[in-house]
Amino acid sequence: MEALIVFIVLSVSGAFAYKCSYERLWFKVGSLFDIISTSSKKNVIPLASKMEVGSNEDVSSMGNFINKFYTEYSLPSHKVLQSLRVLFSLAMMTYTVTIEIILWQIKVAGMDKEVTFITTWVWPLTAIMLSFILILFQPFFIIISLLNKFYNDKFDIDRLIIVTCIILSTLIALLSYINIGPFQYTKNILTRLSIGGVTVMASLSGLATVSSLYYNFLVIWHKFRNTPMSDPSFRNINNSNNNSKSLLWTTDAYIEEKIQDYEHNIEQNVQILRSLEEEVGENSTFKAELMEKIAWYQLELGKLEALLQQSPQVRTFKKAFEVGFIIYCLHKLIITFLKRIPYIIYHSLKYPDDYDYENFSENAASDPLAITIANILDFSFFRFNYQHDLDSLTKQISLFLSISLFLCCLSAVNTTISYVVTLLPIKFQILALFAMQNDDTANVLPEYTNNSSYKGKKRNYSQEQKGISLIKNLVVSELTGVYVLATTLMVRSHLPFEVSQRLKELLGGKFTVPNIVIDSWFDEVYAFACVFTFICIRIAERKLSTKKVSVE
């Protein structure tokens, strides 16, 4: 009876997720890429038309690979768009059902083991859908869209499909045959993809930890020393990709002053650029550098204006969140480098053949997080007299932690996009801002019909589709699916043993990797990302100091 109720809940929630994704989310997820913007006041030079981003043609006039389908195969554009919209909605529905099945298994862990049609039919079917969506369908359309963006004038639709299939096959083969770390524990392609998600999340965690700690430390250090804003070290902070963190602690007056300085610099550089364009033998290298500098100013103006528009309450909340995040980063950094990494090195030296980490698990003296929190609450507040009360509390905390981790994995999609976009060089930031704009679906080819009501409906549909970027929507969907799978692997290490075992039985032997292997891999990638990020920051600062680059 419980399985039937769960199935009804899965069906209703899945239908709701599909409907919301189809009618609303499809039009909203592209806004996650609005990390960068140009100034609304001083957009005095058209960046996309002046800078060479991608191909030499104007990015706004690029063709659409969907139109090529129509030209070559007479396949109506609106049907292709409709299919991609259905694929996106189906993917979101599948992710929702996956999360609910995992949470249900955590909830019923510890009860009498019972095989239901959800574990024997619904979950395997869900896993198959995840495989096709994440490994074949979405990557195919992402790759073909990107190829069309850069090679629109060189590739017809047949060549686009052939090259896309070759690239996709290469990526799948690479994912199948890579044999390092936890990848050697499984041959299941979906599991390997989820391990890739764990790797990306660990890398982003290391990047965020070091960059946040480093730049916030510099800001606080210079504030205590009363360093003037014109100091070169302050200019290095402002030139960095983390200048939004430093600006969070400044006053509105300083931000307005920076806006005026940037606007003045834009006007000066534009005058120089126009004088260069009038010359016969213009210096193309100097012109390109000047264009990049103007582009940087315009992007920074967009950030400053957005910061000024925020209310004091939002600024205060962001400051409080930043302080909490700094404390967490310090804790994570200390635990990883002083406890986890030394023990991993010790284990690899003492037990070089212990590939299953049997000795590691015996010597590791840390309880799952759910048990630790339950014991703290029991000691501090509840003082339970019976073990089953403590077990019940542990299970509730396990469920809460799992829900929190899945919510965090969804927010990690936004974090990934923001860090990747802001870390790109200026030229590629302009590409992300303009070349991935809404030209993907703007040119829906018309269809002839005598039905006037259908004409009106079709016109409205075309208007709705304007403003939608296929690349953005599919990238967000792919990242979400990969992170959901990665969280499914990582969540087990925070759960009690019987809950973790129940989850392992649901996922199946082909889908699971030992908890300790995933945890150790995450720590190793995190530590490497921390060191690599710090080295890159120092190299970038030295490069800025050597070239005496100034934004004043």
UniProtKB/Swiss-Prot annotation:
Gene Ontology CC annotations of this record: membrane
Matches recorded under InterPro entries: ABA_GPCR_dom (IPR025969), Golgi_pH-regulator_cons_dom (IPR022535), GPHR/GTG (IPR015672)
Keywords: Membrane, Transmembrane, Transmembrane helix
Pfam families per the UniProt record, alphabetical: ABA_GPCR (PF12430), GPHR_N (PF12537)
Compartments (UniProt record): Membrane
Transmembrane segments: 127-147, 160-180, 393-413, 517-537
Domain of life: Eukaryota
Topology term for the membrane: Multi-pass membrane protein
Protein known as: Uncharacterized protein YHR078W
Species the sequence originates in: Saccharomyces cerevisiae (strain ATCC 204508 / S288c)
